[in-house]
Amino acid sequence: MSWYEQIEPNVLTYVKYSVEELGYSPRFTSVLDKTVVDDNGVPKKLPTVYIHMLQPAEVGNDLDNTEINGVLATIEIQIFSNNYNESQSLRTITLDCMKKLRFNVPMLPVTTNQGDYFLTIARYRRVVGGGDSDLITEL
């Protein structure tokens, strides 16, 4: 596994640990497949926190250009909950976690009422270098 492929699972592990430490127990996933969602795309268990790294872009090339030195990582977090207050609490906790990992917030979290559940979506972005131990080694 390349160093940049470790970013998503390590972010998920860090956020999951932080949320559970505060007494919440949502389902965490990095995949929204048929084992997690119903035919309408809604998670079968609420609340669910979906954490996914969008396709990263290479940054920080050197003159040799023989290896990937850094990537611009964008993490999307979607929170599905049937309780508005719970969704807002999870939003605040996940935002705090991402700021502690030094991510910027190019898209502030937005919560919408989807009828049977509330959906909060946020995106976080930062440059991660091959030597950034906080996101590459096990947290």
Regions found by a protein language model. Name each.
Residues 95-104:
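A common structural junction motif
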Residues 1-17, 56-70, 105-139:
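Short, charged interaction patches at domain edges and termini
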Residues 1-63:
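Small/polar-rich, solvent-exposed N-terminal microdomains that initiate assembly or binding
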Residues 69-92:
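Mid-chain, well-packed structural core segment of small domains
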Residues 45-49, 71-75, 120:
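A generic structural signal for short beta-strands and their flanking turns/coil linkers
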Residues 52, 78-80, 123-127:
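Residue-level recognition of well-ordered beta-strand positions that form the cores
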